[in-house]
Structure formats: structure tokens, C-alpha cells
């Protein structure tokens, strides 16, 4: 990952998961193989990701292809009443379990993946697929219900900000009173 605005490193790893297996493809030394680009371009194969647009753009910088049948979980979870956008939080909401994100900010371009990196990458891909399949089993909320949830979430966020500001002002006032004495 890059921690500087506008700086992009080439995509170093592609994860392709089924419920039983996850395949990790290191792209650092070989680029994007034609066969993997063909999977992403195949309209008969659904691809699911989280913040998928950036991932697809990164892959397209390695080899041009026209993506087809790609689903971004961040674009659909709100239709199911989930306002969180991070994989760990979405997974916890749906399954009531926590997944580790300890290796998220790691160097995927290392010459060898550690066991922890491979486990993280595999879990990440499997969790994304599991969330998508779980959502397919339930009916999405109506547009009106989604809008209502978004408004409620925004109001709750404003309320939390107001409470934080009040707490800060109260602390500053108490500190000022203490200095007067």
C-alpha cells in the first residue's frame, strides 16, 4: 500500500477464492498473466471484491482488459442495511465473528510471502466471497428503507460529533477554572 496521495504501486497479488480453496498469484515478477486477465474479462464468471474499482484499475495497469461481471461489496452492502464499508466490520455484522486484519498493511512485493501474509490474503478473499454469498440469500431492503438508514446514520454521526465537541469544551472549561484558582 501507498501512504502518499497520488502514489500507486503496481498490484502485487491476486487472490481467487472458492469456498474450499484460495489461489494466490504473485504478480511482482511475472506481471498479469493472460489467463487471469481473461477471468476478469469473462462475463460468465462473477468476480467479487471490496473497493474493487481500485484493484481492477491496478490490474489493468499491468495488462489491458475489459472487466466484466465484477461486483464491489461496498456498492451493495447498504442495500442490506449495512453502513460499514470495511471487510472486518461487514464480516462481523453478518457472521458475528471477527477476522484478523493484522497483515493488511504489509509489503506484498517481498520475494516470499510469509505464512501470515498467505493466511491473511486467503482469509480476505474467502471472507469477501462468504459475505457476498450470504447477502444473496436475503432480500435487499427497499430504496426508501436504505435512505432512511443513511439519514439515521448521518444523524447519529452528527450527534457523536456534537457530544465530542461538548466534552472537549467542558474539559477546557474545567481546566480554565482550575487555572483560575
Where is each model-derived feature located?
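Acidic two-metal-ion nuclease catalytic site recognized across multiple nuclease folds
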Residues: 127-181
Amino acid at each position: 500500500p501507498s501512504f502518499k496521495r497520488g502514489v500507486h504501486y503496481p498490484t502485487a497479488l491476486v487472490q481467487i477464492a472458492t469456498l474450499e480453496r484460495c489461489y494466490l498469484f504473485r504478480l511482482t515478477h511475472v506481471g498479469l498473466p493472460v489467463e487471469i486477465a481473461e477471468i476478469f474479462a469473462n462475463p460468465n464468471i462473477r468476480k467479487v471484491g471490496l473497493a474493487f474499482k481500485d484493484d481492477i484499475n491496478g490490474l489493468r495497469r499491468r495488462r489491458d482488459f475489459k472487466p466484466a461481471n465484477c461486483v464491489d461489496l461496498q456498492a451493495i452492502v447498504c442495500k442490506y442495511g449495512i453502513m460499514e464499508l470495511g471487510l472486518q466490520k461487514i464480516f462481523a455484522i453478518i457472521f458475528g465473528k471477527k477476522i484478523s486484519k493484522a497483515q493488511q498493511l504489509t509489503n506484498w512485493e517481498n520475494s516470499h510471502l510469509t505464512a501470515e501474509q498467505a493466511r491473511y490474503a486467503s482469509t480476505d478473499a474467502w471472507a469477501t466471497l462468504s459475505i457476498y454469498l450470504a447477502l444473496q440469500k436475503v432480500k435487499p431492503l427497499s430504496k426508501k428503507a436504505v435512505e432512511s438508514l443513511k439519514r439515521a446514520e448521518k444523524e447519529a454521526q452528527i450527534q457523536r460529533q456534537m457530544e465530542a465537541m461538548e466534552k472537549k469544551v467542558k474539559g477546557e472549561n474545567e481546566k480554565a477554572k482550575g487555572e483560575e484558582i
